[in-house]
Structure formats: C-alpha cells, structure tokens
Amino acid sequence: MGQWIELTASDGFRLAAYRADPAGPDKPRGGLVVVQEIFGVNSHIRAVCDGFAADGYVTIAPALFDRYERSVDIGYTPDDIARGRELKARAKIGRAHV
C-alpha cells in the first residue's frame, strides 16, 4: 500500500503524488513513473502503482491536475469522462507544466 507525498516542480509549485514502495529488505528493481489518465490519481492508478511495487519497483504517480484542481479522483461514468476531458483541456496536457 502506497502513501501520498508532495513533489516540488522546477517553478516551485507543489503537487501531490502517490508513491508505492516495494516491501521487504531487497533492493528495489528500479523506479517507475505512472502517468494518470483523465480521471486523476484515482483508485485504478493507485492500484497500478501498488502492483508494480509488489513486483519490486518504486512507483510514483504525480497528480498532474493539481495546478488546476487538487485531489482529482473521479470514476468512469459518462459525467466523469466529460469532467476529465474538461480538466485535460484546462491543463493543456502536452505542454511542460510539471
């Protein structure tokens, strides 16, 4: 099970990220960055991070929408998809913001 941490972007902006670490004394196999979908760092993305951690990888999923709306965690209904698309448009994903 992972935990929420705080990251600082190059411009000083602070954003949340979900971090999952491997259990046990063994050295991690590596590190991974999991990029959220339009639904934010929701339960699915956290489960993906936890799964990679179970396989030995330190995994971080930054909350990329935090600049526009904090703690985005939405589901998969048609209304959720519309909201996610709106957030993506506001965030202008594709430009370097994080």
Describe the role of every protein-language-model region.
Residues 1-95:
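N-terminal cap/leader regions of alpha/beta-hydrolase-fold enzymes
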